[in-house]
């Protein structure tokens, strides 16, 4: 049976939470493989809302949930999020939750640095959540990170913290911040160690054993492929790789173990924060999409920018992530529009192109080339079969398939998990 990677095919906020929850009921193991607690989503089960930003979605269904080595872990947020779920009646214990022992930790110094940089970025606002994600990844790449396993070896922790602070205190002096004492970070770590250590494991071994046993594994991506540090709209990206290939590197399970890549794709386009957005609408249509689609960030509460569906960027993501099929979400938000536009190509300096260029300047200059389709007055909300959809809505979906070069495997027509049209089961071989 196939294992499934879920990846956002746009700039995040595509509705992955509902789809992951829908799939997690069919999965045996759910794995987070990148990011941190900077991208949140809400699950609604039996009328109860669960807000998650670090923990895998499978926890609310009692499935084995794994935080992979590709995730940066804020230990204090981990404790807070687990306590919040327990208060809602979710049983969390080492039988259902594992953390990769080689995952890097987010510390208070990372949050300080993140906030300071974002506040003084010389006009270039990346739009980070100021939760320390980027600086934590920097320390990982710089080979000075404190990792989860270090909490189990307190006798070796002090020299590692000293080495880390030799770097950070140099930065803090340059930014006019007070230096941090080694004892401060040691206390920060040791105060939470006992609440973290029961969950640590060599998760690559756990996943390999579960794969060999025939378990279905769901890899839960955060954010979107266009925020990928390599393939996204750099520098307006996140600090990790968000494309589907990261599922292997960020979990320790080899790429041949990954079968189906499901790209979660919104029926229009949104983006939070700064960066290029060729199809952005700063008019009443953009306001309509934002209001009807409730486009506000789960973690930050920031209003999302809205625009028409951009087939160029999704087609590009289909290739860079090897997307097998897409889950098209929020189709119901388009109900009632007289006409709907799809960006099919760009114009750059007088030339037509079918890709998003890599350079920041070129990305800012591209202009969308649209095709206009008739809208529909009937509702798609709550549809659970193709026969429930208006004819023009079906034509819209089919045209998207043609333009991006990937079929629709699932179609979501409301926030309710049951309002889903299944075309192809991603877990089916």
UniProtKB/Swiss-Prot annotation:
Membrane-spanning intervals of the chain: none
Signal peptide residues on this chain, from the entry's feature table: none
Residue sites binding Mg(2+) per the record: 13, 40
Cofactor note: Binds 1 Mg(2+) ion per subunit.
Location in the cell: Cytoplasm
Principal location listed in the UniProt entry: cytoplasm
Coiled-coil stretches noted in the UniProt entry, renumbered to this chain: none
GO cellular component, one term: cytoplasm
Catalyzed reactions: IMP + L-aspartate + GTP = N(6)-(1,2-dicarboxyethyl)-AMP + GDP + phosphate + 2 H(+)
Amino-acid positions noted as binding GTP in the UniProt annotation, renumbered to this chain: 12-18, 40-42, 304, 330-332, 412-414
Annotated IMP binding sites: 13-16, 38-41, 129, 143, 223, 238, 302
CDD domains from the UniProt entry: AdSS
Origin: domain of life: Bacteria
Cofactor entry: Mg(2+)
Positions of the catalytic residues: 13, 41
Keywords tagged on the record: Cytoplasm, GTP-binding, Ligase, Magnesium, Metal-binding, Nucleotide-binding, Purine biosynthesis
Protein purpose: Plays an important role in the de novo pathway of purine nucleotide biosynthesis. Catalyzes the first committed step in the biosynthesis of AMP from IMP.
Description of how the protein assembles with itself and partners: Homodimer.
PANTHER family: ADENYLOSUCCINATE SYNTHETASE
Protein name per UniProt: Adenylosuccinate synthetase
Organism: Brucella anthropi (strain ATCC 49188 / DSM 6882 / CCUG 24695 / JCM 21032 / LMG 3331 / NBRC 15819 / NCTC 12168 / Alc 37) (Ochrobactrum anthropi)
The encoding gene: purA
